[in-house]
Swiss-Prot record:
N-palmitoyl cysteine lipid sites: C17
Location of the Peptidase M60 domain: 1085-1388
Protein name per Swiss-Prot or TrEMBL: Accessory colonization factor AcfD
Lipid modification (S-diacylglycerol cysteine), residues: C17
Keyword terms: Cell membrane, Lipoprotein, Membrane, Palmitate, Signal, Virulence
Compartments where located: Cell membrane
Gene Ontology CC annotation, any one: plasma membrane
Role noted for this protein: Disruption in Ogawa 395 results in decreased cell motility.
Gene: acfD
Amino acid sequence: MKIRIVSLIVLGFLIGCKHESIITPTVPADGSGGNALNPGLVGGYLPDIGVPDPIISLSMTLDGNLKFDSSLLCNDQDASHFQISQKDNVFCTINGRSIATFTAPFDANKNGRNTDSEVLSLISADEYRDSPVRQENLQILMKNMATIHGDKISLVFRSTLDALTFENYLRHNLDLPKDQFLEAITEKIANDNQVDKQPSTHVPNISPSFTPGTSSNLNSPFVSANAEESLSYIPTDVIPSLGRLLDSQGRVINGVSYFSNNTRGITGVDKTGAILNDGSFEFSWGDIISFSIDTFELGSTRANKTDFYISELGKDNEGKNAEALIHRYASIDDSKLIIPDKVTQIFSLYPNVINEVISLSLPNGDIELDIGDGKTQIVPGEFFKQFDSGLAALIDQSISPISRFKFEDSLPKKKSAIDSESSQIQDIINKLWGATDTVQANGWKKVDRFHIFHDSTNFYGSTGSARAQAAVNIANSAFPVLMARNDNNYWIDFGKPKAWDSNSLAFITEAPSTVVPDKVSEDTSTFNLPFISLGEIGKGKLMVLGNARYNSVLVCPNGFSWGGTVKNGTCSLSSDRDDMANFFSNVIRYLTGSTSNDVIVGTNIPEVYFKSSGQTMGSKANFELDSRFSKQTQQLTSFHDLDVNTIPLIIINAYDYKGKNINSPYDIPLSADVGSPKLSRSDVTDLIDYINNGGSVLMMETIINTNNSEISRLLDSAGIAFGIGNSVVADGNGPSGGHPDRPRSQREHGIWVIERYAAVEDESSGQQTLPYVINSDGSIEWKYIVENRPDDKPKLEVASWVESEAGDKLITHYAFIDESQHWKKDISGKIIYNVAGKPEVDNASLSLAKNKVLDAFKNSSGQRAYSECKNSEFHYEINCLEYRPGNSIPITGGLYVPRYTDIKLGESEANAMVKAANLGTNIHALYQHERYFRTKGKSGARLNSVDLNRIYQNMSVWLWNDLDYRYDDKQSDELGFKVFTQYLNCYTSNNAGGNTTCPEELKDELTQLGMIYDEKSGSYAGQMDPSYPLNYMEKPLTRLMLGRSFWDLDIKVDVRKYPGEVTTRSGGGDITLDMRNNTAAWFAGNRQPTGQWAEAHQPFSVSVSGETSPVTITIALADDLTGREKHELGLKRPPRMSKSFVIGGDSPKMQTFTVPYGGLIYAQGGNSQQVKLTFSGTIDAPLYIDGKWRNPLLSGAPIGEVVSDTFIFTAPKANLNADGYLGGIEQFAKDLDQFSADLNDFYARDEGADGDKNRKATDKSMPNNRHHFVNDVAISVGAAHSGYPVMNDSFITSSRSLNTMPLNSWLLWHEVGHNSAEAPFNVDGATEVVNNLLALYMQDRHQGKMSRVEQDIRYAFDFVNAEHGHAWGAGGAGERLVMFAQLKEWAETEFDINDWYNDKLPGFYIEESGIKGWNLFKLMHRLMRNENDDQINMKGENQCKISGIGKSDLLMLCASYAAQTDLSEFFKAWNPGSKAFLYPDDPQPYYEGGITPSGIQRVKSLKLNLPQKNPLSINSVTQH
């Protein structure tokens, strides 16, 4: 992945930047050359001896492993493959800038080279080879800035800033010590990253119950459970066929009786009675065949193929046990098994009853058993034990089994909760899609988007809809390869914000809503029926694709989508992406097993036709596969006895095309004419034999009518049903297509649209209101839901207005603008393209169109009711003029139908097609999965990741609560509650109950694996070991039980690792707290530490008196980590910790509580100066307060606190020894208070509790209000995060040192700065910048300079010039902070605060050199809050309080006013608040927002002097 970092480079280094030329190194003609990093370096000359120099083929790597692509040029050639002569030097450049020189790297006399193909490593270049530090730092730089996929590395920079950053670090910092270089890089990454996750379809592997009212139509809204059975091929007459019965190793089984409606016999014996011993038997296609030994039923199967495996004769255990029984009694050699006559004779002595005597349904080991009505259960293995006693033993002894090996030795030990086929299917899909780095590294080609052809119909000039016929897998011999999504956001790719919520309502994101649109993900995506399926017949494969047009892709893989032709054997077009070529390369590789194109492909298709406009077949071409797929395409007239080694693949069509024989405008010319089949019965039989012998067949056809023709027999034999009728892919532009009057539409190019909900009548007032309410907390309530009126669900619409035109005709206009209608054109009407090859937008024309739309909607004040939308990441906002990027697919005609549709493919999409199971089987599967990892693969069974995640998510719903689950042995156990409650009892020392107990065998396994402590563990016996750091993907059961322990106190977790045990038990008693509420800032609240600790699972009591409002008691301040991806992969503590209770007020004055893990106790509320709390059963925690230890450092709790006048600091108690901290804990507390004072100063706040607009966040007049900083072993996001409390990811229990220095901690300043940031600096894009103003102030104030920006400010001038007018939008947090640093440094010499005060300056100003530049910022803060200030000598109207202008303009106006200098050029160059927009398939960013002309005009109207010193030119920081 690419990690974007920020710095500076020269203009010539950029990719595609305007007005810039590419600079290339000058290479002397004699082969020597200069080195840009070492200009004097020459060399590489070898004497000419009259023999041509050998030509050497080269590739360039970073380190011998990571291979560069064409982004790096070496000797002006692609670095992935370039050639030089032996005596040449090698010069490598990126965008014309020299990066490496190799002086005569292949001097044979020097290097001993003896091959013609070589690999160079960049770190071995002349510039780096002699310096290990430079080599290490170069690799750090490359790996942080480049894009890496597998073993490929690419240095294509997406922005000016990336390129300049790379250059800066490359040229100036490679000699830094590695640690410093790494810190500088990662600091930049962290800073800039701050600037800028389904329920799947679920097919249980148990027999479903039938529900009345269902339909067998797979496209109906209520489909029956066994609907797939109705798709099986049913012959219209008898089709005699020959098959074989095999064991799992492919050996034929002889001597087994078989019968069906049409046949009866013994395997391996022909109809004449001849013993063939080939396992053969005759059948009629489609019959149900049963197999037996005399009357003992081995099972049955449907006869739709020619090879039948005995394990397929029954479900799971029944099939496996049938094979085990055959193995037990048969005589076996390498190729065959024979049931002796003796076995049949003995069985015949027990007719029918033998089926009761020997049960094939008994499980072996801990397996899942079908107990009927969709229920399963884990039961002990009993199959072989039945032969130890009773009649089964007598029969067994009479036969004297030839093979007595145990079932578990040859067959799987258990049935997994998820079929083992699922993981195999996932692997195959990954290969066919090229979906993972792993398969790509093995040569499978990535398919990013899959092309869906549209029907060749013509309505209003538009082509037809997307066409992909369903190809449904109806047996486990087949599986879907591709299914299109059918959820209500189907056209939006995974990872992007949804257009609709789960109720198909728009997300209301307008202020003051706090709604954040959900992302499209696996969790909420659903799928239609497959249109590509892959099945197996014997050794071979059959793949079906639901559209005949795909044949044309094989002829012209880059020229098939629209209007393709072939002339003189050459495709006329080559503009289509490689995705479909890659897909078919993967398909042919998988079907043939060949990694090269050196194969012969057979076919019965003479010609292909290319998609074009109109109701036509399209341009015709001979069906000759492109050379990248095969070396020869051979036309076949017969499929009999084909050699699968000579022709490993056949591509077929089953029917002729309708062609011109169409009778309706709805007919599709290239659909199958089912009345004109191309395959006979013998053809199909031959094809089945061909596939069974190892050949593969690929069929791409548009069969619209369900039929039972011969092709259906071929497909059925592979487990596929085809020709169901309707297309299973929706048009890719979304449900509204590109219609301008329909919401959520999309087109080829960007559109501007206003979408809105019409007002509804309020039932109580009769007034017109919006159909939703934005609550005070920012949440949304929909009135029709609240009022339970489902029929009144509002409908989203495109805003429209009506105008009268000539003749008073009323015309409806829609708030819809197609950006393509506003492209620049030359005088001949041709579109003008920019240097990037994109059409240039006529901004003037577009602005007129947007203004026309916006001016059409006015509010009651005559102002525009709408403005342009603000969220550049979300393209489905409502109530504003939204820009929605196009999808680059041309639309056609008056119905705005796209030429084609494409479907996003990738690893996430591949993982979306899996299955799950019930409670009992799920929990057992998770245990077996965990067992697998705990024994390092020696036992247990691993689940593939998709199944693991699905099961895990499902189980979390059932487990993360305190419900009492019960098993009723008198009822069918559909949900598996027996096993489920057994596991709960294992984790609760049998306190879960539920009519079950923990099985001793399971308990022993859990203790042996270290999941639960055994009896030898003393007081810890029965507790669970949380196994920190806990990766749910390896230990899912432990993770789920850890989650449940938060609610279910019967599950006890070992707390020794976290949060820690108590060491002494003294504690409790009375404390009195000042709980008055004088809070001035939310982030410095009045939650009070009590100095008490609640011990895990030990009840404690709290009583209250003196309160005037309820008191909230909180135990443990800790983030909820549940579901956070990175934490879940390495969880260091219980994900949920905090518990809260209320006492006093309307609640009881005294209550008793118990908590699962323990924690410090806090109190909040009360609203009284004297609130008395009485604790019983609690433990003293170390507490330093009022300058002394109220509870000693050696108190029993593992975590303690330092409470200064303005701060609470929470950390492991050993940290509070404060070793190495000058002045110790006392000074630490003072430094915390100094930071609080500096914070108040920076924001120009000097008022106490009785103040108004300038109240301090903390003050002696508000003694119970404090900032809070909590150290924890894990927090929700980042290394730290803001809030109340601020959380820090640092928890070293063994350290005796404090981890924070209040006057030298960027982390502390940064996070508290988030809390306290104020206008006018909080412009768009300043979230991770405005907070750092406080940090920068603290650094300057206490460390003597602004070292954080010291490096970046050096090249600020060049950067701003390179990105003039949008430097803010192009920059990261580091660059944006430099803008403010330049302003501060400018103010250091150009601004005098005394000009604003007649009398003594307030104390928050500092006139010390090096610091006084901050006075400008403090004044701006003050002016923003106070329209008038008696102390300030106002200079006309306070421009910082001007309303009605944007935040960017206000910042510029306020700064200019405060500085009494026209700073508009400075702000215009940086353009704070500007945003970068990236559009599909366009690497060039576009910038919007920021400073406006009207804002500049406001500044100009002040008639201020221009700055004598240009702040943009400042390139250093003051050191003092």
